[in-house]
Design a protein with these regions (language model features):
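Non-DNA-binding regulatory cores of transcription-related proteins
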Residues: 94-97, 107-128
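Glycine-rich phosphate-binding loop signature in dinucleotide/nucleotide-binding domains
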Residues: 44-47, 93-99
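Domain-level recognition of soluble alpha/beta enzyme cores
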Residues: 121-153
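Short, glycine/charged-enriched secondary-structure capping and boundary segments
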Residues: 19-22, 65-69, 88-90, 116-120, ...
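Active-site-proximal alpha-helix that buttresses catalytic centers in soluble enzyme cores
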Residues: 2-3, 7-78, 82, 110, ...
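Short alpha-helix plus adjacent loop in nuclease-associated cores
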Residues: 81-91
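Generic beta-sheet signal
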Residues: 4, 96-105
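Functional cleft and adjacent loop/helix regions within the main domain
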Residues: 80-82, 142, 147-164
Length: 164
């Protein structure tokens, strides 16, 4: 079994209109939500073997709350700059020794991945939400369209009652 956990970056700031989209940091709510989601995942899911992360500031800041010293951490330019096909290629090239992979990324690519892998259309993939997809294969190169199932999901608003 292989597990791909998709995590959208936490809420980002739009306070500085002159800031390039790539450089936008997390806002107050994002900095509040990301560690809470991270704590929840540490209870619910095993630690990943590999984290793949967009190089955008908000994705990197979010991933920082989830990283540990034992997990391989890789920044992949394609997660921010390219579309679904290029991200699928990254996933298919993952070493099979990494059976539990977390990917920190952006919309609409994350929703498109859920639909591609499971056939399920998400109405929304909220900030800092988590969707884990499991595949009954041994190699990442063997995953195909609609070959996975959602095995876990977490939406921050479902368990975080107070917002800063």
């Amino acid at each position: 079994m292989l597990y791909l956990t998709l995590i959208r970056h936490a809420k980002s700031s739009w306070d500085n209109p002159s800031l390039d989209d790539f450089e936008r940091p997390l806002n107050k709510r994002g900095l509040y939500t990301a560690p809470l989601v991270s704590q929840k995942l540490k209870i619910k899911l095993p630690s990943p073997d590999l984290i793949l992360c967009s190089p955008a500031k908000r994705a990197m800041q979010t991933a920082d709350f989830f990283k540990n010293n034992k997990t391989i951490f890789e920044i992949k330019q394609n997660i921010y700059f390219d579309g679904l096909d290029e991200i699928l290629e990254i996933i298919r090239q993952i070493n099979p020794s990494c059976s539990n992979v977390w990917l920190f990324g952006h919309e609409p690519n994350l929703s498109e991945m859920v639909e591609f892998f499971t056939g399920k259309i998400l109405a929304k993939f909220p900030t800092c939400a988590v969707f884990q997809i499991c595949f009954s294969v041994e190699k990442w190169s063997e995953i195909e369209k609609e070959s996975g199932k959602i095995s876990f999901s977490l939406i921050p608003k479902d368990f975080i009652l107070q917002k800063p």
